[in-house]
Amino acid sequence: PTLIGNKNSIAETAKNLSLDISNFKIVEAKDEEDSASVACQMSNENRSKIIIKGNLHTDILMRSYLRKEFNLLDGRRLSHIWHMTTPQLKKPLFITDGALNVLPRIDIKLQILKNAVQFYNKLNSHKPKVAILSGTEDPIESMPSSADAKKVMELASEEKINAFIHGP
């Protein structure tokens, strides 16, 4: 892994969290914009497979990501994945999409699901468990997100997305 940012701040944070980052590469960056640019440039040059945002504003990373010179757009829908760990859970949670897509159509929701599964598979070797959430367990007309969840599950099954998918 490569960490990008203020080396002293990175080292202090790792120490405070009791994390051993001695095998990590650390690239100095002067500020958030520089960190985002360095990450996108590294991805453009195939020196990284995934950009994982830490203590960096999403809008700053997205501005860099969208710059044409980095050539990172591949025609797929962009989506946001939040990686969450807690002491109570033995496995991390990946939550999508909480930051980029507002009121997505069903086809966009399916693409967001595909993005999340593809991301997960870059980090893990086993089949992910996916929960498509809504405010109710069964699809009902008065809650469109529940009907959308059912449709996304059906489409995911047809497309044979390699994940255990349940919901709403």
What does each model-found stretch correspond to?
Residues 1-168:
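Anion-binding alpha/beta catalytic cores of soluble intermediary-metabolism enzymes, centered on
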